[in-house]
Each structure stands twice: as structure tokens, then as C-alpha cells.
Amino acid sequence: MTLNKCNPTTPSRRHTVKVVNNKLYKGKSFFKLTKSLNKSGGRNNQGRITTRHIGGRHKRKYRLIDFKRNKDDILAKVKRLEYDPNRSSNIALISYEDGEMRYILEAKGLKIGDKVQSGINAPIKIGNALPIKMFPFGSILHNIEIKPGKGGQIARSAGSYAQVVTHEKNYVIVKLRSGEIRKIFSECKATFGEVGNSEYMLKSLGKAGANRWRGIRPTVRGTAMNPIDHPHGGGEGKNFGKHPVSPWGVQSKGKKTRKNKRTEKYILYNRKYKK
């Protein structure tokens, strides 16, 4: 995997940096694990905008990823590595000994032809999924479940991981890259290793149009609007003279947004607020 800086033949290519991986499969995705994906444009069923800055984008299809890794004690072979337009990480197509095919997240260091396995009896190696209680201190993990059987929800993006800090009765303490330290139930599954494609954050889009290909519309500053459109709008000069707020007047810096108090007991150290 290399970074390719484009020649400055046009103003946009002058700043474009691409991530090139020659090991990725260049054909179509596996048909039985692919389904259509409709565009919403950020609108709900009434046609009203519920999420701003969404619209356009290139057509894409959704790849069904196996986040649960619930096919235990059966060896699978990595057939190929693929690009996935729906996430920052790449994916791997694996074939089980009974013939079933599944997509999983590509772990860093996973190669074509490698064997992977899931279950409590699986060895601790790159790409294998086990209950988190089986991993020793200092282990690097990704695709970590919060509820057993629900599927991995933590550390799924490119280059992300969590580290096992200690074991505590029925829980395992892990540290996330954000700095958060939290408790995970010991029966939850996790995959050994970190997510691949860690160079993803080093690329440069080069032009605004590249963001439009991804379905991201422009974000207009509140100070550039009129008073009718935003609390920061209007006035002479650039200073809006008040605490930063959202377009609806809600405090936008420093306000806590987490509402699920029931699960706060599992967060030992918050990434923003010391506990």
C-alpha cells in the first residue's frame, strides 16, 4: 500500500494524494453478498431534510459484512481483498470449508490465502474472532461487540483498534483510541488485530468535487448567513458576539449530548470529561 501524489497537471490534481493498494480485487463484488442501496438525500419519508449536508454521490451497492462472526469452529480461507465504497476500511471475502462465503473487515496484515476462524477454540492470530475474555493483557482488537451476539460496534473504521487493559470478574477493560476506557462484557466477541487501510487518513481529496462524489454537500458557516437563517447571521463584520450555537439555538460547544444514562456505568474514563 503506497501514497500516490498526483502530478500538478490541473489545479485540483496539484493537491491530490491517493492511497494505492495493488492487492485489491479489481472485479465486481460477490453477487450474493451485495444489495442495492437507495439515496435519501438526507430527507425522511415526508421529504423534509433531517440530516444536512447530504446529497448527490455516485451510485454504489451495499456489501453485507459479517460483524457477528458467529460461524464458530470452521476454518475459512481469505479469497480476496476488496474495496468497499461504504466504509473507510477494506473488506475481505472469505470462504468456509462448507462452501459458505462471507465478507469481513480486513485486519492489518491479513493476506490472500490466510486461514481465519471464530469461536472460543480459535487460536489468537490476526483476523480470528474470539470471546474478549480469551485475549491477554495488551492485545490489540477491533470489531468489538457491546452486547453478545449483536455484532461488532466498536473499532470498525480504517486503522482503528482498542487495547485490552485488564480483566475484572465478568468484564474486560479496554482502552479506545479516543482515550475512553470502558468495560466490555467478557462473552462479547472481538477480532484480533487492528483494522487495515490505516493510510486512509493521509490521502487528500484535492478538490471540492471529490466530496460531492461521496455525497457530502457544502457546509455553510452561520456567520455567512442572514439573521433569518442562523443565530450567527447578519451584523457588520465577522464577529457574531455570542456563544456558538446550532441553527436552532442549541449550544454547539461543550454541551453534553449523550442521553443514555443507563450505560454510563460501563464508561470508566470519558474521552472528554474526566470521571
From Swiss-Prot:
The keyword RNA-binding applies. Residues 221-275 are annotated as: Disordered. It comes from Wigglesworthia glossinidia brevipalpis. The gene is rplB. Keywords: Ribonucleoprotein, Ribosomal protein, RNA-binding, rRNA-binding. The lineage of its organism: Bacteria, Pseudomonadati, Pseudomonadota, Gammaproteobacteria, Enterobacterales. Part of the 50S ribosomal subunit. Forms a bridge to the 30S subunit in the 70S ribosome. GO terms for cellular component: large ribosomal subunit. Residues 253-262 have a biased composition (Basic residues). This is Large ribosomal subunit protein uL2. GO terms for biological process: cytoplasmic translation.
